[in-house]
């Protein structure tokens, strides 16, 4: 799925990555599963509301050492399709390519990211539009894969966490690197660079702990790594099922915006 997520792409894209749904315990080992999801978003204190319902098709072939995730969803004035493929090496999921097409309020947003492990580089090309004014953002960037460090997308991050192959510190904090559009920390929702954008690697860290009431693992995740509409002092709250699949997510964003995702089970 796309890694340079605007708020719109966060709406369309998260289900294929962080939201690889509980209920895929067997598919994670080997096989195919088709799952559903529901995503709701309100903007400007409910002045604008959007809902997206869709399916995620997940295929893992451990014998061949590869995986593929395809996500499609539709809602009022929005449709999305994302295909993410990767390889499995020494038990770890590693992204190879992600292609996304999102149509939102009549505007098409596209993104392609490739990970070249032989050439030791990441390449990303994207054309997106801001939500409120529809301003065009173009991203064309190449990065070197850092020696001795793993780089993930949202799909491989969730897969590695679920299979307990994501890197973990002694204090229980999981971490990896993800690629995003390089931007100023105080970027506004309709700010656009006339010179286009490069890309950068940023750390993604979260520390799950059991909820006192339910016993479910929960974590606060800084999604500024994926959306300029997020703020680091308002991390998203995610809840995981016993098999370490994401069960739900709630997030407060800027301009009175709220994002909620929930698992709807097998499609």
Positions of predicted regions on the chain:
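Surface-exposed, polar helix/loop patches in the mature regions of secreted/periplasmic/lumenal proteins
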Residues: 97-143
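A generic structural micro-environment signature
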Residues: 7, 16, 20, 94, ...
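N-terminal export signals
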Residues: 2-3, 9-26
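Intrinsically disordered, low-complexity peptide-like regions
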Residues: 1, 138, 150-151, 209, ...
